[in-house]
Design a protein with these regions (language model features):
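Extreme N-terminal starter segment of soluble prokaryotic enzymes
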Residues: 1-7
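Structural alpha/beta surface segment adjacent to cysteine/selenocysteine redox centers
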Residues: 19-138, 142-148
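Short, intrinsically disordered, charge-balanced linker/junction segments flanking boundaries
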Residues: 138, 153-159
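Short, cysteine/histidine-rich loop/knuckle motifs that typically chelate Zn2+
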Residues: 16
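Short pre-active-site segment immediately N-terminal to redox-active cysteine/selenocysteine motifs
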Residues: 10-13
């Protein structure tokens, strides 16, 4: 059977990508040998602070964006949102996490021994587990995923 290539464009700070993970997992479960999933990182929130400050200036700024995100997430049973995202923690950019994840993805593709081992999330590769944990670090734990120390701690926790 030929695999269908699915190119998934994503940003680690995008709430829609965070909520869509459940659908990607379902796709992988239902067609384990039928899809070739390729992750592509795009800089929607490359300048997150500026994007929200300007885009939400007349709608309450960061507090307004926070309220919008919390309201949006209430419609989804499968996600949790920390009440302080975009207020208590405002990552400057998603770019640092994208570069960190791309490096991990390349290590996994090359079979690097430092990135070997079991995934921490069933049905995920180690790279996918890391990506999920980074998303959760922001959306659920309100951590600054623009901070390399935060990203390194997440990877270290995976072993």
């Amino acid at each position: 059977m030929n695999k269908i290539r699915v190119e998934y464009f994503t940003d680690t700070l995008c709430i829609w990508a965070y909520s869509a993970q459940v659908k990607l997992d379902q796709l992988k479960r239902e067609y384990p040998d039928g899809i070739d999933l390729k992750y592509r990182f795009i800089p929607i929130f490359a300048a997150a602070h500026d994007r929200i400050q300007k885009g939400w200036a007349e709608k309450g700024g960061f507090e307004g964006y926070n309220a919008h995100q919390l309201k949006t997430a209430r419609a989804w049973e499968h996600v949790e949102l920390h009440p302080g995202i975009w207020v208590d923690t405002v990552p400057a950019s998603s770019t640092v996490s994208h570069l960190f994840l791309k490096a991990a993805q390349l290590l996994e593709q090359d079979g690097h021994s430092g990135f070997a081992g079991e995934s921490t999330v069933p049905g995920h590769t180690r790279f996918e587990s890391l990506m999920w944990r980074i998303r959760c670090a922001f959306f659920e734990d309100c951590l600054d995923i623009c901070d390399l120390a935060v990203l390194t701690a997440i990877a270290d926790d995976m072993g």
